Amino acid sequence: MSIQGQIALALMVNMAVGSVDASQEVMKNLSLNFGKALDECKKEMTLTDAINEDFYNFWKEGYEIKNRETGCAIMCLSTKLNMLDPEGNLHHGNAMEFAKKHGADETMAQQLIDIVHGCEKSTPANDDKCIWTLGVATCFKAEIHKLNWAPSMDVAVGEILAEV
């Protein structure tokens, strides 16, 4: 491979890695801002502190969230952010606005919406909306990991603690 080819390859790899890092940063910002009303939702829905561990470990690969209350909290947070339509599905316009407000460009925001929409379709129907929401969140997490967009929660937790 010529020197020019090697330089071009190095630049493409650097841009791809930079893109992943930027996506992880956006996902961290989205996660931090999404969870800001968690205490409010916990009080309103009388949710236990057991969900704190699920939110702390949410992005850890291999961590399974099984607590129904965590699904209820995610549903509550989504509602507070006006990201759900009257049927409880993702409101695409509001979700797009939220993603872009917290650092996603148009392409990434659309990809996030497409992922959630796909997860909504693939998650089995359940009369218990909390369980269904938990299924959608689990699917979303898996898809974000496939893209290598999951944020490093060590950094995110450090930022949360710095705000306290």
Curated annotation (Swiss-Prot):
One Gene Ontology term of the molecular function aspect: pheromone binding
Alphabetized SMART domains for the sequence: PhBP (SM00708)
Signal sequence, renumbered to the chain: 1-22
Record's keyword annotation contains Ribonucleoprotein: no
Protein keywords: Disulfide bond, Pheromone response, Pheromone-binding, Signal, Transport
Disulfide bonds: C41-C76, C72-C130, C119-C139
This protein's record includes keyword Ion transport: no
Tissue localization of expression: Antenna.
A GO biological-process term: response to pheromone
InterPro entries named among the record's database cross-references: Odorant/phero-bd_Lep (IPR006072), PBP/GOBP (IPR006170), PBP_GOBP_sf (IPR036728)
Family: Belongs to the PBP/GOBP family.
Role played: This major soluble protein in olfactory sensilla of male moths serves to solubilize the extremely hydrophobic pheromone molecules such as bombykol and to transport pheromone through the aqueous lymph to receptors located on olfactory cilia.
Subunit (UniProt): Homodimer.
The protein's name: Pheromone-binding protein
